[in-house]
Amino acid sequence: MKRFFTLIAGATAAASMAALLGMSAAHAAEPAKASKPDLAAGEAKATQVCAACHAADGSRGLSANPILQGQHPQYLAKQLHEFKSAARKNAVMQGMAAPLTEDDIRNVSAFYASKQAKEGFARNKDTVALGEKIYRGGIAAKAVPACAACHSPNGAGLPAQYPRLSGQHAEYTKAQLVAFRQGDRTNNAQMATIAANLSDKEINALADYIAGLR
C-alpha cells in the first residue's frame, strides 16, 4: 500500500514537473512584446539626427525632403529599417539610419507620427483636373489603378500598409514616382509597376494634386 502511494506521489510530481516545463517552454516560445514608444526619447533623437533636414517637428522643411509629421509610425519605421539594410537606397539616409537602434526607430517614428499634419496646397491650377482624375480614377488604358484605392480618398493612407500622402511636398512626391519608374527606388514592387506607366506630365499633375489633398 505504501508502495502504491509512493508511485502515485511520484507520478503526480512528474506530471506537475511536465506541466511546469510545458508552461516554461510555451512562455519561452512567446515573442517578446515590443516596449511602448518613448516620445520624449524620440524627440531627443529626432532633434539630434533628423531635424536639420526634416525640421524639429517633421513639418514643412526643404521640399526635396519628405514631411514626416502625421505619417503612420509603421511606415516610418519600415523606411528606416530599409534605409538601414540598404533595401532602400539613399546615401544620406543610410548613414543616418545605420546607428539607430530598434528603440530609436520605434521612438522617432512614434514622435513624428504624434504630430498633427499641416494642410498643404496645390500650386498649378491648370493640372488639378488631371491630377484628380488619376488619383481618384486611375488610367484604365495604362492599367494604372486609382491612388485613392490604397491611399484613401483624402490621402490619409492606411496604417501599417499605405503611407499618408496628403499635404506632401509635390517635389518630393514627384521625385519618388520618378525614382520608382526609373528603377532607382526598388523597395516597393507595386509602386514600381504603377509608376512605370506614368508620363512626366501625369506625374507632375498627380504630385501637385496630392500636395493639396486634405
Which stretches of residues belong to each language-model region?
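Electrostatic cytochrome c docking/interface patches
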Residues: A26-A46, S59-A64, S114-A140
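The canonical Cys-X-X-Cys-His
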Residues: C50-A56, V108, V144-P153, L206
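Gly/Gly-Pro-rich "capping" loops immediately C-terminal to redox-active cysteine motifs
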Residues: L39, E43, G58-S85, Q94-P99, ...
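Conserved hydrophobic/aromatic "anchor" residues
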Residues: A46, F83, F111-Y112, F180, ...
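Bacterial N-terminal signal peptides that target proteins for export
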Residues: M1-A15
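C-terminal segment of classical bacterial N-terminal signal peptides
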Residues: A14-H27
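C-terminal capping alpha-helices of c-type cytochrome domains
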Residues: A98-G120, E171, I194-R214
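Surface-exposed interaction/gating patches
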Residues: E119, D126-Q161, S166
